[in-house]
Amino acid sequence: MEVTCLLLLALIPFHCRGQGVYAPAQAQIVHAGQACVVKEDNISERVYTIREGDTLMLQCLVTGHPRPQVRWTKTAGSASDKFQETSVFNETLRIERIARTQGGRYYCKAENGVGVPAIKSIRVDVQYLDEPMLTVHQTVSDVRGNFYQEKTVFLRCTVNSNPPARFIWKRGSDTLSHSQDNGVDIYEPLYTQGETKVLKLKNLRPQDYASYTCQVSVRNVCGIPDKAITFRLTNTTAPPALKLSVNETLVVNPGENVTVQCLLTGGDPLPQLQWSHGPGPLPLGALAQGGTLSIPSVQARDSGYYNCTATNNVGNPAKKTVNLLVRSMKNATFQITPDVIKESENIQLGQDLKLSCHVDAVPQEKVTYQWFKNGKPARMSKRLLVTRNDPELPAVTSSLELIDLHFSDYGTYLCMASFPGAPVPDLSVEVNISSETVPPTISVPKGRAVVTVREGSPAELQCEVRGKPRPPVLWSRVDKEAALLPSGLPLEETPDGKLRLERVSRDMSGTYRCQTARYNGFNVRPREAQVQLNVQFPPEVEPSSQDVRQALGRPVLLRCSLLRGSPQRIASAVWRFKGQLLPPPPVVPAAAEAPDHAELRLDAVTRDSSGSYECSVSNDVGSAACLFQVSAKAYSPEFYFDTPNPTRSHKLSKNYSYVLQWTQREPDAVDPVLNYRLSIRQLNQHNAVVKAIPVRRVEKGQLLEYILTDLRVPHSYEVRLTPYTTFGAGDMASRIIHYTEPINSPNLSDNTCHFEDEKICGYTQDLTDNFDWTRQNALTQNPKRSPNTGPPTDISGTPEGYYMFIETSRPRELGDRARLVSPLYNASAKFYCVSFFYHMYGKHIGSLNLLVRSRNKGALDTHAWSLSGNKGNVWQQAHVPISPSGPFQIIFEGVRGPGYLGDIAIDDVTLKKGECPRKQTDPNKVVVMPGSGAPCQSSPQLWGPMAIFLLALQR
């Protein structure tokens, strides 16, 4: 008997279908969540409209085998500031509190390696309405030779919105319209930012002095309410006017306390005052209170422009600016310029010579310079001139010119810069002029032209400068256009000619230029030299990790290739197997000269040679490893997600079956698959049922199938599937299967609606009745529900099971009806049987009616069955024969009785062809848990001649 059952188990539930189920990806975008409007009038332009701040939820529904991978991308929309792109690798795209800048076109790209990827898009339009802004402008013009003045007022209302807003102007509570009278004009100006409407009041009249309201509306799109702003126009309405308590340019000494007052001289309504600083925010410690700005202990960094702005939405804002200058001096420099006319670069007797001195000061024009020679003030003469503001030099530079240089002019010259009468320290710089004063030369020390360091180490680039005086050295990059130094600057000054770099990286490799500065030395053509920096870094190899599959007995070649490194060569390669060192493989002569890869050949894959191989490659700077996992394991199965109607329910129990389908990934890469190990576990439970599924030779693209039976409604299950070959277990694949209620169809001989799914098998609420049927179970029912009426659980007796019922408590009244309408069925037989369970318990039970709605000539409802009154606190079954004459629907009608104790429930509705059974089915049926039944049970339709033959053979 056991042998027969095992043989039946192997033959009956397992099927193999044809090959070629691999299919390219197909995609469709559906929307969910808090969408407010969806415009699909134009098929080529799908628009999903959502309110700003709501949650955007888009789903990319995909088909294809293997299961496609989904990627979401976005390009900017009209409300976005610039191009944006974001990638989300998930079938569901969810954005909480979406902003207007997140509007745009969203693309769903699905690909599975078969054919070309599927790309679908939808445009997301974010709806919003900002607070409106209202400004007032006035003009006064003379009319008829100054006899009187005509005053015109423009009220400008501006708002940002999507979609475009509608404007409504009101005077008090009265709505104004265009050309309502000669004194009112409403128009939209050209070339304006945002949406604007202007209310023009011509030749202002007494009645025009009133409160004006600008109301903006997007016509309640997405539930966005209207917004409004009000302004009261009076005969004193005026734009703001300001004056400052200080001059527009304020020069102070460092350390002083600065106070600036911005005084209002006009404006109605009362203007608002605000201080700002440019560039950057107000200094730390600065206090802006009303129109008073206080800066304690001001420093040089606090210099800048301080703006006082007054606004009252009348006219243009009034603005006053104070240029605060904090006295300071820094960076004293000098220049030695030989005779320019003779284009000389050396100091020579008999030629002209110019010494220049400059400091960076605030204010620059207030700096005074004084020259000294050998400690004494320089005396002006025909050969010694002091000039200021040389056009060839920086602004406010003092120059000492020596005409026809004599030997007596040699000496030490000192330039002193100062602020007269200010507590700012003087700055000075010395210049020594002698026969030893020569222009600079620059060179790279021997052996320092090429600097080679390892990545992450410090580096020092050096250039030597000779000459007197020695100018600073300026460093820059040569080989990379517009490249910055590690300091973030394009040019860096070093006083000793050494550029020090910390923790160099590979992108710092290249040529660096060192050149003499034209200040603090000779003002001549810069001298240059170059230093090459080579940054060595460890090798990068591929593959970093690779899964190598091969059948037992077949050879395998493992290759580790060098991608990049410095130096770009393999100095050594070491192979390890499971951490143990392997002898070096033989070297190919052609690859020994410049090796860029390392190879290891396995003559045959065996159980002993299967495992982890590591190739460690070194270039004398560092090392990198290629990892290979060699085995004869079978690849994981590929679940087929496009099975039509995989769920099948059973009318006599709260169980369902599921059609599980899959293909085997690369079955020819390893040994043939002998069988599959199937493990199925109900979610939130630990015990699993394990079954073995034997198979014949599996080919690529061949669709395999197994029917999972005795699954409990409405639970979900985790399914794990593992292929087995002669090598052993392969890679496991897992998925979650969910119960989905199948839609009733009379074409299926055994199809029961348990109402476990929210779709309730396609049933709908009638729109013409008084109230609705409710779907619930023992876990979701209202704890305050009336006692002594309604079922405690569904027909299965489990708290998770759902049923449909009518709640007859208030505000329901006697005779109120609730109708539940089935999908439309095409009549293909003369007789049908409607079977269902009902629960009618309570002293106020009304009636439960079954109607048939015929659709062959309009909609005609016919009573097929009716039951009234209290039938006890039990589930009972009814079989109702019907004979529709054409397409039809069935309707369950619940009628409310005289009181609130009249809840009626139905469950497990079945529609099948043929006549109804003569005997009623016992409602107390037994529910079989998954795996608890006899191992040789199977679906009834699979019992055929083979089963009869096996039973006969057993006897």
Swiss-Prot record:
It is found in: Cell membrane. This is MAM domain-containing glycosylphosphatidylinositol anchor protein 1. Residues 779-798 are annotated as: Disordered. It is a lipid-anchor; GPI-anchor. The keyword Mitochondrion does not apply. The lineage of its organism: Eukaryota, Metazoa, Chordata, Craniata, Vertebrata. Residues 751-918 form the MAM domain. The gene is MDGA1. A lipid is attached at residue 932 (GPI-anchor amidated serine). Residues 643-743 form the Fibronectin type-III domain. It comes from Homo sapiens. Interacts heterophilically through its MAM domain with proteins in axon-rich regions and through its Ig-like domains with proteins in differentiating muscle. Interacts (through the Ig-like domains) with NLGN2. CDD domains: FN3 (cd00063), Ig (cd00096), MAM (cd06263). It comes from the Eukaryota. It holds the Pfam family MAM. Has been found in brain, heart, skeletal muscle and kidney. Found to be overexpressed in tumor tissues. Keywords: Cell membrane, Developmental protein, Differentiation, Disulfide bond, Glycoprotein, GPI-anchor, Immunoglobulin domain, Lipoprotein, Membrane, Neurogenesis, Repeat, Signal.
